[in-house]
């Protein structure tokens, strides 16, 4: 045991052991095909757990507006459906895609439905939930439409679900995260 601890310490000191990054999380697109989050590594991202039957669902309009405004500048919204909050995303992948495209004209990428909290929490959200928001809250996602701005290189800024896509602080954070 002692030798193993010394070995681990030596590797950590040498910088060879690193914490998982959000880009390492395995996730699939909404259609079930594997996605590689490393494809987004040089971009500014807005990762949002989304739901179709929530009082905050109209935020899709603002999320799509951000995608249109900044998409050609190295930015993308990533929508991650979740059904953990009062069952407000009960649909199949096909139903979610149809709802988002026909009701809100969503063009940003949508990923598989995942758990953002609890025992079956997706590894992406294990990383994101460790980040505190401006009020110091870190931990479980509180509701649908919690937002995480990820700058190129992986720095994360967290915003609560009631922060709208048009919020000045959110927009300012996105603009600051855009690649040069």
What is the role of each PLM region?
Residues 74-91, 107-118:
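Thiol-based oxidoreductase modules, predominantly thioredoxin-like and allied folds used
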Residues 29, 49-53:
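Amphipathic alpha-helical repeat scaffolds
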Residues 43-44, 53, 57-80, 101-104:
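Conserved helix-turn-beta segment immediately C-terminal to the redox Cys motif
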Residues 13-38, 58, 122-123:
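N-terminal "domain-start" segment that seeds a small globular fold
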Residues 123-126, 131-180:
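Thiol-/selenol-based redox modules, centered on thioredoxin-like
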Residues 94-144:
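Short, internal strand/loop/helix patches
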Residues 1-19:
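N-terminal amphipathic/basic-hydrophobic helices that include classical n-h-c signal peptides
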